[in-house]
Amino acid sequence: MNIEVGTTIKGTVVKVADYGAIVRLPGGKTGLVHISEIADAYVRDVRDYLNEQDEVTVKVLRLNDRGRYELSVKQG
């Protein structure tokens, strides 16, 4: 599946860390939701909002120079 910047798609949280969450996208690709892109409010602990295996809707913000997707839940 071709994932384009600006699209909104569903994914599954596969890892939660202090800095954000890794989300598996369709086609087996993964992307990062940085802690600042989880909610409009201040996020002290990512686990208050996201947990592994959660289904989330994310917006694809960009594909960085390393070929990694940067995602947003709050814009999704």
PLM ranges: what are they?
Residues M1-G76:
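Single-stranded RNA-binding regions, centering on S1/OB-family and related RNA-binding modules
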